[in-house]
């Protein structure tokens, strides 16, 4: 049954959904990687598709920018459409010099300055972590594809234009691999509603060196990240 934000029916989505922030990237993923993809959502332009990858039913849908937006879609997919696993496939900014532009980062955990998980967890700190099997499958998929993926903590920021750039120094000290805006929220939603989640990000810009990819590149490239996500789903089916 349709929700206020998703005009699909039960069964339209696969049990695994890849979620980029940009709905146009979702369309690109469906057009490029899925066979027989059909549109299953277009409310507010947040495009969603379901197709098959090597015979396996998989969906892809945008989640927008920031924890409030992605939390709405993740919650509805899990509770109303039976989704069991969400893989965020997005971009992040690097804060460490040993992390390079276009590196693939697998978010084992997600720090955040958002209060949403504290709201869920009775004002205590909640360790927002990815599902271990999904992390392991993503690492194995990356190795099989010959992609060197970094695994560790990422930081989900509430503000894109931060008033406190010194926080980047703290992140670097604590070994944070990249900054994005959604993973901690998706991990929190998954934990609350009994699903599993993982964030795989490609470094789109470097906060230290000021290197960056273009908007067009972010929309239509980063194929290694998508291939890792898709192949990890197949590995999960074999477990």
From Swiss-Prot:
Catalysed reactions, semicolon-separated: a purine D-ribonucleoside + phosphate = a purine nucleobase + alpha-D-ribose 1-phosphate; a purine 2'-deoxy-D-ribonucleoside + phosphate = a purine nucleobase + 2-deoxy-alpha-D-ribose 1-phosphate
Residue sites binding phosphate per the record: 21, 25, 44, 88-91
UniProt cross-references to NCBIfam families, sorted A to Z: deoD, PRK05819.1, PRK13374.1
EC number: 2.4.2.1
Name this polypeptide is given: Purine nucleoside phosphorylase DeoD-type
Subunit description: Homohexamer; trimer of homodimers.
InterPro entries with a match to the protein in the record: DeoD-type (IPR004402), Nucleoside_phosphorylase_CS (IPR018016), Nucleoside_phosphorylase_d (IPR000845), Nucleoside_phosphorylase_sf (IPR035994)
Binding site for a purine D-ribonucleoside: 5, 180-182, 204-205
Catalytic residues, chain numbering: 205 (proton donor)
Function: Catalyzes the reversible phosphorolytic breakdown of the N-glycosidic bond in the beta-(deoxy)ribonucleoside molecules, with the formation of the corresponding free purine bases and pentose-1-phosphate.
Taxonomic source organism: Erwinia tasmaniensis (strain DSM 17950 / CFBP 7177 / CIP 109463 / NCPPB 4357 / Et1/99)
EC main group: transferase
Disulfide bonds, paired cysteine numbers: none
Gene this chain is encoded by: deoD
One GO process term, biological-process aspect: purine nucleoside catabolic process
Gene Ontology CC terms: cytosol
């Amino acid at each position: 049954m349709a929700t206020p934000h998703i005009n699909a029916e039960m069964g339209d989505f696969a049990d695994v959904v890849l979620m980029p922030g940009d709905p146009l990237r979702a369309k690109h993923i469906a057009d490029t990687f899925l066979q027989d993809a059909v549109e299953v959502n277009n409310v507010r332009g947040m495009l969603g598709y379901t197709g098959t990858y090597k015979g396996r039913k998989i969906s892809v849908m945008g989640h927008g920018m920031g924890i409030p937006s992605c939390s709405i879609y993740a919650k509805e997919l899990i509770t109303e459409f039976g989704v069991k696993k969400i893989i965020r496939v997005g971009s992040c900014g690097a804060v460490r010099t040993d992390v390079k532009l276009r590196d693939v980062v697998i978010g084992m955990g997600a720090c955040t300055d958002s209060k949403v998980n504290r709201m869920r967890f009775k004002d205590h700190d909640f360790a927002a972590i990815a599902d271990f099997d999904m992390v392991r499958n993503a690492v194995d998929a990356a190795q099989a594809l010959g992609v060197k993926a970094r695994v560790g903590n990422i930081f989900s920021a509430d503000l894109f234009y931060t008033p406190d750039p010194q926080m980047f120094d703290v992140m670097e000290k604590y070994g944070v691999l990249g900054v994005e805006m959604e993973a901690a929220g998706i991990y929190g939603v998954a934990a609350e509603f009994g699903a599993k989640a993982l964030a795989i990000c490609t470094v789109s810009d470097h906060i230290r060196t000021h290197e960056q990819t273009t908007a067009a590149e972010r929309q239509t490239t980063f194929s290694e990240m998508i291939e890792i996500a898709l192949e990890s789903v197949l590995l999960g089916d074999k477990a």
